Structures are given as C-alpha cells and as structure tokens.
Amino acid sequence: MSEAASGVTIERPDPVVTPLAGLIGAEVDVDLREIDDDVFGRIRQAFLEYVIIVFPNQQLTPDDQLAFARRFGDLYRYPHSPGMKGHDMVLPIKLPSGVRRGRWHSDATFDERPPAISILAARELPSRGGETAFANQYAAFEALSDGMKELLAGMEAVHDASSHNRREEWTTHPVLRTHPDTGRTALFVNSEFTRRFADMTTEESEGLLEFLTTHAHRPEFCYVHRWRPGDVVMWDNRAAQHYPVMNRPEGEIRRMWRVTVAGDRPRYDAPDT
C-alpha cells in the first residue's frame, strides 16, 4: 500500500549536510531518486550556501539525472557537443588520460546566457587521479581591496570560444556578477574564455586580467574533489570556477555524465550607498 493510500505520513529525517572545506563545498547524504519537495528545498538551500554539493553513493540512470536537474529549471544544451544517444541533454565527458594541463573556468561564458548549474555523475573512474578542483568566486571577490572592487564595479570583459577554435562566438559580461538567487557578488572572469576588458586592447588588459584570473583560484578559496564510484557533484557556475585535473595513468578511463541547467544573462547590481 502506498503512503498516500494508507493515509500515513512518514517522517523522513533531514538530509545531513557536511561541509568539506573552509569556504566552499558540502556533502549531502541523500538518495536523489527519492526526494520530496521539502528535501529538495533543503538541498537547494545548501547548494546556494556552499556553491558545490557532493552526493555520494548514487545509482542514477540518465532519466534520474535529468529529472533532478529539471527541478532547478530548464536545461542547457552545449553548443557543438553531441549528447548521449537517446538522451541528448546528457553530455558524455571523456577527457584525455596521462598528465596534461587544464584551465580554470566557468562553463561556456562565451554564451550570452551561460549555464547556471552543472551536475556531473561519475560512471567509470581510473585507479588514481582525475580529480576536479573548485574555487569560490564569492570569496575571490570578497578578498579584493576596496579600491579594486570600486575599479571593477563598472567594468565589462569580452569572453570568446577561441580556446575551442570558435573565435566568432563571443559576448561581453560584467567583471563582477550579482547572483540572481543569493544577491551576493562574485568575480566573473576566467582564464579559458575571458580575453580582454571591453573598450581595451588585449595588451592593455593583460596585467589586470592575469592578476584577477590567478587570484580567482587562490588555494584558500578551493576544494579538490577526489571522485569515488557513485559520486554526483553539482556546482554553481555563477559563483564558482572549476579545473579538471588531468593526471591519471595513460589509457585509463574517466567517464562522466553531465547535465546542465540553463542560466540568465549575467548582471551586476551596484550596492546602495
């Protein structure tokens, strides 16, 4: 007999939220296939607070992962990246093995409306390596001096997809971004997609942009996730950067499924004075 048919309300315990680092990340112990609206609300609250959430020991099908993502909003389709056969909104991720250099970034900031949330599920893991690092961009902003914050408040930057051989895909975004749900301010430039400041040349932009994109991932802002079988990790592209660590043995597979939630156009709301 179902819970509804029996007329009995079963009290489910609140999900346990365990912080993972000083300024970013928490683990939430819950089965994502069996969450009601109340539990989802608590997950969303933890997500907005901690910026990335790790869900251990999941057994999600593509439909399960899509259903969870849709609780947050419409889905985002990556340009020029084919999805999984039969589930075109699920993007298979297979990075090269061996030791290679990655790039710190927020996803697809060359888009006028970059994705808001990424949800990555581990499907097959190497014997070692293949971590993902995350950096809190609220913390990156808050650690800047008052003078630097004042300078950046009126600035915009040009983002393009030239690192993906598509230089013609570009847009401009504010250098500081107001999160649409929390109202907090985040630094919003990254070394993969941000090319220069608007109304400046690349040469003129170079020094300040290099400082900001390096400052963005100071170690104290970061959490490094060591993937385990069954892990699902979601992060907020509006307030975090991430870095795929490509350091696993040659020939060993790291296979992931990614589902992405669509976002809005970045904006900066100056604080009231």
Each language-model region and where it sits:
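Fe(II)/2-oxoglutarate oxygenase catalytic core
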Residues: S2-M234, R238-T273
